[in-house]
Structures are given as C-alpha cells and as structure tokens.
Curated annotation (Swiss-Prot):
Protein's name in the database: Taste receptor type 2 member 42
Glycosylation sites: N163
Organism: Macaca mulatta
Top-level taxonomic group: Eukaryota
A cellular component annotation (GO) from this entry: plasma membrane
One MF annotation (Gene Ontology) recorded for this entry: bitter taste receptor activity
C-alpha cells in the first residue's frame, strides 16, 4: 500500500510529466505542421522535432518508472522489470541530452562571430558537424548500454544478498566494481555537459567582442546581432542550468542507489533529475520566435474561448 510519501512523490512526478508533455507535444506538432505545409525542413526544426520526440519517450519511461517505484518497488529487485526500464531510461536520457547539446552548438555556430579560420570552416560545415556529433552520440550510446548491462548485473547481485552491510564487509569487490562502472557512466554524461558549457562560453566571448566593436564604431550597443546573441545566451544559459541540475542529480541518484538502494531518498532525488526533460521545452519555445509566436496565438485563442459567454439552455 502506498504511504503518504509515496503519494506525494507520485503527485509531483505526474505534474512533471504533464508539464513536459504539454511543451514537447506542442513543439512536435508545430514543427511537423510547418514542415508539411512548407515541404521543407530546416536544420533547427529537425533538431527540435527529434528532441521533442525523444523527450516524449523519455517522459513516458519516467512516468512508468515513477509508478513502479511509488507503488511496487519490489519489482525492481527482479531482472525482468528493472533491466528493460533502466535501459530505456538511459537510452532516452542519452538521446535527449545529446540532442539538446547539438541544439546549443547549432545556435553557437549560427549566431557567434569569430574571424578565426577554424571557426569559419566549421561554421560553413555546420550541418556536417551536427551529423558527426549525433553519430558520435550513437557510438557512445552503445558503450553506455554495455557499461549499464554490467552495472545492472553487479547491482542485482548485491540486491540478492539479505544483508548488504555484511556482504560489503566480507568482500569489497562488488561495491568497487559498481563504483568503477558508475564513474564510466558519469564520464559519458560529462561529454555533452562540457560541449554545452563550451558553447555558452564562446557565445559570451562573441557577445563581448561584438559589443566592443559597436562601441568603437559609435553605433551603440543594441542592434539585431546583439539581441540575437543575448537571446541565444539566455536560452543556452537556461538549458545549461537545467543541465547542471540534471547532471549532478544523476550522479547523486546513482551514488545514493549504490549506497542506500532504492529508498525514499533516491525517489525524491530523481524528481530534480527529471526537471530537465520536463522544463527545457518551455525554454526552447521562448527562445524560438516561430514557436513563441504560435504559443502566443494559441493562448490568445484559448483566452477568447474561455471568455465566450455560454449559450442559455432552452
């Protein structure tokens, strides 16, 4: 039977799921309808649509995982449920993280200005760079799945023991193996985090350089390019903030699971972990002019619909 803490956890998890689904379904529908209408798909729309689809899948896995953890946590002691759910969660998390990183890099190449020949060469081949990064992420996903298989096997061996403390005192080998595998999984998450941080830093340097050039030429500090820099920086910075919360929550959740198992503390740490797939869609909507304008029109129509007087009953 679910306790009060379980009910609170499930309520918060459901709220995160609804928020995330609203934003990502909106992004997917708008971009798909625009692509069908224009018979052309731009790179940014393709990345946004793939990110929305990946996040929707991630949110569905998260909801199922939260229901199992809150209502039937004993199922995770068996390999039949735990292995496929954990694999699907990590795959969806990996794809969502890398697609968000590719989007940050895309905005960096699209908006930043550097006279360096290497930057110009990469910018000219921006679509190829994004394709290479996505291909690299697929190879890393295979490596991640192999490491995760070993991680699940080792953790299930520990869960099968009736006394975890006695077992760890008798032999440190399983715990050491889990720690090593956890480090490998963390390094795999660190790569997109570093790329996103690097994109933000270079965007900031480009903004500083562009603003200084405008002041030297007596054109002021506000023009279309400067505003584009600032909008991109706000969006990437917001994504990076959620990314930081997501990254560190992932590390804390995994280490807490290794030490304490699947208990109440681990449950509520995962709520912070799920903030990234739940909230980043609204940052993307605010940062994209087409999505933002469509959202404003939709809210305006909803507002007018709610204000419409109800017809009198006959």
């Amino acid at each position: 039977m679910a306790t009060e803490m379980d009910k609170i956890f499930l309520t918060l998890a459901t709220v995160e799921f609804i928020i995330g689904m609203l934003g990502n379904v909106f992004i997917g529908l708008v971009n798909c309808s625009e692509g069908i209408k224009n018979q052309k798909v731009f790179s940014v729309d393709f990345i946004l649509t793939c990110l929305a689809i990946s996040t929707i899948g991630h949110l569905l896995v998260i909801l199922f995982d939260s229901c199992v953890v809150g209502l039937a946590p004993h199922l995770y002691a068996t390999d039949r449920v735990r292995r496929p759910v954990t694999m699907l969660w990590h795959m969806x998390n990996h794809l969502t993280t890398w697609l968000a990183t590719c989007l940050s890099i895309f905005y960096f190449f699209k908006i930043a200005h550097f006279p360096h020949s290497l930057f110009l060469w990469l910018r000219w081949r921006m679509n190829r760079v994004i394709a290479i990064l996505l291909t690299l992420s697929l190879f890393l996903l295979i490596f991640d799945c192999l490491v995760l298989e070993m991680f699940i096997d080792x953790s299930l061996n520990i869960i099968d023991k009736s006394n975890l403390t006695l077992y760890l005192d008798e032999s440190k080998t399983p715990y050491d193996k889990l720690s090593l595998l956890k480090i490998l999984l963390s390094l795999n998450s660190f790569i997109p985090f570093s790329l996103c941080l690097t994109s933000l830093l270079f965007l900031f340097l480009s903004l500083v350089r562009h603003t200084r050039n405008l002041k030297l030429s007596s054109l002021g500090s506000r023009d279309s390019s400067t505003e584009a820099h600032r909008r991109a920086m706000k969006m990437v910075m917001s994504l990076l903030f959620l990314f930081i919360v997501h990254f560190f929550s992932l590390q804390v959740a995994n280490w807490t699971f290794c030490i304490l198992g699947n208990n109440k503390y681990t449950q509520f740490v995962t709520l912070a972990l799920h903030a990234f797939p739940s909230c980043h869609s609204f940052i993307l909507i605010l940062g994209n002019s087409k999505l933002r304008q469509t959202a404003v029109r939709l809210l305006w129509h909803l507002r007018n619909y709610t204000k419409r007087p109800n017809p009198l009953p006959l």
